[in-house]
Structure formats: structure tokens, C-alpha cells
């Protein structure tokens, strides 16, 4: 009987020299999130008992901000076998029957559904591995005999040099008892002085244990070793996201020009126009329209709102139902009420704008005094004339009007007209 509890062991040590970067490989981003965040995010979809990440010392400080994971330090980077051995020694209290999923931090596109399939296939087996078909002959290979996995070898060690083969995706699933016993039997490779996790397949077979395998698509199994691999993975990620959204009822007018983050949420009947970028933390409710060349991050766009073109929204901003945020408008750390219009050339920062208000073209909320940021509150049914500067901290109460061209430095009472500009002087030219 397969255990219902499982633990993820994610291998993330090693810098990744082929990336040619000061940043550790697993922290390079796809869809605005690091590779490691992708792996952790997908693991959490399965509600595991524990997520353990094996890292080397240089990486551990960078990962302390990660929540709900256990960091295990691999003192010396002696290969994947040593990494899993180190993890299992740190997880000694894990029940023998608990399922352990071993995954690489640089293989970020593996779906939780694929892991579920591997877990379900574990019944009656000591170990289940993941393979995929590819024309790239550099991958390690799964050697299959009579329907059973016999060993995993490097491409150069494939004696038969098969034209068609299953490549090794690197993901393994086993019960804790078997994994503990098998990794302890891995011997150090005499030429590289490392311990290879893939050796446990042949070790299991020699112990008369059954080893199974599951096949997935090559795009999902993409491993990342260099910048070109990163480009491919980003492409596959975006293509998959576009399909997910269109299948769920979102209209993408030109899908190939729209870019998403891992956590982007868009409800059905929304329309996304060309050249829109979604950063982290964006949620779009049903019926909203995002017009071309808009850049959104950390914001909520409510039902039937319209944003863009050429709009930037960020900083935990909420745009209310049926509100319109127009061209060349930036809204940051603000709340915009239902049916409010901010249509042209404006900056709204650290502000709350009520319902049914109109913010005229060229309005600037001056929220920063050089040291600190201050709040501005604009009530409902207000009209702010064009080219107005609102100097925070400031309160403009309901149903008030700000005359065009004003510089407002004092609070404006309810149902009031505020004018703050020089009187026009007109003289005849001689």
C-alpha cells in the first residue's frame, strides 16, 4: 500500500559555471520566479509533509527568506548521490513508508501531475524514474530491458548507441526505507570522485528490486545548464501559460506577445491585448481588459475594469470594478474605486481614490518629500482638473472639484471648489 505522506528532496547545490553568472544557477528566473521557486511551488501543489532543499554553503544565506522549507547543507559538493545521502541522514525521523520525491532545482517545469503519476506507479516497486524522448544525444539514458528499467548510463556509456532512447529527466520517487538503503550503497566514482544518484538503479536491480519508469514530454523535462537552456525553458513556460489561460476562457489577442509570471491569475472573459507583461502578484478578475503595452505587477484588477494602453500598475494596487486607467498612467501602492477614470498622463502614488471620480490629464500625486512618502485621499464623485499637483499628505473630500492647473497643499472640504493658481494677466503686445 502506497503511503499518503510524502517529502520532497530538492537538489540545489552547485553554482552552475556554464551560466557564466555571479548568481547561483537555481536562482535564475523563468516567468519572474527563480527555478528553485518553480520546483517548490509545484511541490506545494501536492501538500507534502516536508520540502527539504539540499544546498551548499554559499547558497544557504540567499535561501533563508524562503518559507516553509527545510534547508540541508551539503558541506562538500560530492555529487547528487552524496546530496541525497546527506538529505536522508537529516531526515532520519521520516517513516520508512513515507514517499520521497527527489527532484533537481534546475529542472523547473516538471508538473505536479507528472509527480502524482510517478507516485501512483510506485506500487510494488522500489523506485520509479522519469524519462523523456529527445533528439539531444548528450542526456543520460534509461536502459530498458523487457519493460523494466535496468540502469541509467551516460550517453558515452551507451554500448548500443541507440538512435531512439529515453533520456533521464533526473526525477526519482521511492519509499524512504528503500531510498535510505540504496543511497548508502553508492560508491565513489574513481575518475570524478563523486557519488552519482543514478547508480541506485543498477544497485536496486542487483538487489532483485523492481524499478519502474514513467515517460513525460521533452519540454517539461527541460534541464537548464546555460543561458540558451534558460531561453528555451522561458519559451516553453510562456507557451504553456498561454494555453492554460486560453483554455480557461481568457482571450489573448496576440498570445505570442503576452508574457506571464508563475503566479499570474486571470479569470475568464478577460481580454488581454498585445504586448502586455505580467510581473509577480497579478490577479485579473472576469471581464477586465488589459490594453497594449501595459506592465502590471503586484496588483488586483477587478471585474470589467480597463487598463491601458501604455499603463504601469504596481505596488499592491487595486483597480476597482469598471474603473478605467488610461494611456501613460502609473498607479503605485494605491486603491482606485469603482467607475473612477484616470485616463491620461498621470501619476497616482500612495493614494486612495473613491468611486465615480475623474482625475484629469497630467494630474500628479506628489507623495515623496525627499525622505518619506505620504498618503493622499480623494473621495467619491470628485473632479480633479487637468495638470493639477496634489501635495501629500492631503485629503480631498467627496464631491469636491479641483480647478485645472492647481497646486493643492491644503485639505479640501466636502462639496468645495479649490483653486490654487496665479491669476491670468493678459497684456497687449506693442
Curated annotation (Swiss-Prot):
Residues 1-227 are annotated as: Pyrophosphorylase. GO terms for molecular function: glucosamine-1-phosphate N-acetyltransferase activity; magnesium ion binding; UDP-N-acetylglucosamine diphosphorylase activity. UDP-N-acetyl-alpha-D-glucosamine binds at residues 25, 74, 79-80, 104-106, 140, 154, 168, 225, 314, 332, 347, 358. Residues 249-430 are annotated as: N-acetyltransferase. Mg(2+) binds at residues 106, 225. It is found in: Cytoplasm. Keywords: Acyltransferase, Cell shape, Cell wall biogenesis/degradation, Cytoplasm, Magnesium, Metal-binding, Multifunctional enzyme, Nucleotidyltransferase, Peptidoglycan synthesis, Repeat, Transferase. The lineage of its organism: Bacteria, Pseudomonadati, Pseudomonadota, Alphaproteobacteria, Rickettsiales. Catalyzes the last two sequential reactions in the de novo biosynthetic pathway for UDP-N-acetylglucosamine (UDP-GlcNAc). The C-terminal domain catalyzes the transfer of acetyl group from acetyl coenzyme A to glucosamine-1-phosphate (GlcN-1-P) to produce N-acetylglucosamine-1-phosphate (GlcNAc-1-P), which is converted into UDP-GlcNAc by the transfer of uridine 5-monophosphate (from uridine 5-triphosphate), a reaction catalyzed by the N-terminal domain. InterPro entries: Bifunctional_GlmU, GlmU-like, GlmU_C_LbH, Hexapep, MobA-like_NTP_Trfase, Nucleotide-diphossugar_trans, Trimer_LpxA-like_sf. It catalyses: alpha-D-glucosamine 1-phosphate + acetyl-CoA = N-acetyl-alpha-D-glucosamine 1-phosphate + CoA + H(+); N-acetyl-alpha-D-glucosamine 1-phosphate + UTP + H(+) = UDP-N-acetyl-alpha-D-glucosamine + diphosphate. Acetyl-CoA binds at residues 361, 367-368, 404, 421. Homotrimer. One of its GO terms (biological process) is cell morphogenesis. The gene is glmU. This is Bifunctional protein GlmU. PANTHER family: BIFUNCTIONAL PROTEIN GLMU, NUCLEOTIDYL TRANSFERASE. Binds 1 Mg(2+) ion per subunit. Its cofactor is Mg(2+). One of its GO terms (cellular component) is cytoplasm. The active site is at residue 344. Its EC number is 2.7.7.23, 2.3.1.157. Pathway: Nucleotide-sugar biosynthesis; UDP-N-acetyl-alpha-D-glucosamine biosynthesis; N-acetyl-alpha-D-glucosamine 1-phosphate from alpha-D-glucosamine 6-phosphate (route II): step 2/2; Nucleotide-sugar biosynthesis; UDP-N-acetyl-alpha-D-glucosamine biosynthesis; UDP-N-acetyl-alpha-D-glucosamine from N-acetyl-alpha-D-glucosamine 1-phosphate: step 1/1; Bacterial outer membrane biogenesis; LPS lipid A biosynthesis. In the N-terminal section; belongs to the N-acetylglucosamine-1-phosphate uridyltransferase family. In the C-terminal section; belongs to the transferase hexapeptide repeat family.
